[in-house]
């Protein structure tokens, strides 16, 4: 399964013990699902865990069943639908929405007075319209709805809860998203996916360690290249002196250093300085 599927599977382990939280979660699902109108509700998902949760969620929150559910053997996109006027009226009544009014969807904050209800709403929104990228590849979590006011008001709710989502429009959809690993960790923890949040944290630690190792390797490689280049230049000079019969005419310490370099072409200046008798400093041998 993908990381996003694993997150949704973890979220679906919530027990649905509190009615108000079930209503809030159902509210999030409806505002972020495929179709939510006064005549039809349609929810399409590829998450089998979410598909297994939906009938229990709607029974707990609204006391209703779906008119259409996927068959047990169905694969791919799983579809749920409600077209019954009575059932839709029951949902609207529970959510304190006017069935006969012109329906411009927005978030009724009166339904989300407690923190647990806010988190349940966000959990439902993510289950219906959210996704998160494998943190080993990159950091990106988003929630998508076709309803502009819903997205703007959900953004306000997230900000009130201490998050800083970014917004964009794409293909007629309104998207809230996070690209910072710490925001993704905190969001997943808040809506009930603590194990997945730890997965994001572990991926970040691994990336930081790997980047640190790469930086050190690059630095050491660059230093080694400098040592090799310097050594090759010194070896060429020593050979030229030797061929000209000038090597033995060098002053004692310089001659000793040249002979050590000829015998130890891969040694650093610091290592050569330590080989001299008596040893001298790196700066002295460089001079």
Feature annotation, model-predicted:
Residues 43-45, 142-146, 275-280:
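Short helix-coil junctions and helix-kink-helix linkers
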Residues 190-287:
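Extended mid-to-C-terminal alpha-helical interaction segments
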Residues 36-42, 136-138, 268-270:
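Short acidic, hydrophobic short linear motifs in intrinsically disordered regions
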Residues 15-23, 111-118, 248-252:
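Structural motif
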Residues 52, 56-201:
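DNA-contacting interfaces and partner/effector-binding or oligomerization modules
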Residues 1-94:
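N-terminal low-complexity or simple alpha-helical regulatory segments
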Residues 24-32, 120-128, 259:
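Short, hydrophobic/amphipathic alpha-helical patches that form generic packing surfaces
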Residues 34-36, 134, 167, 234-239:
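Short acidic (Asp/Glu) and glycine-rich catalytic loops that position anionic groups and cofactors
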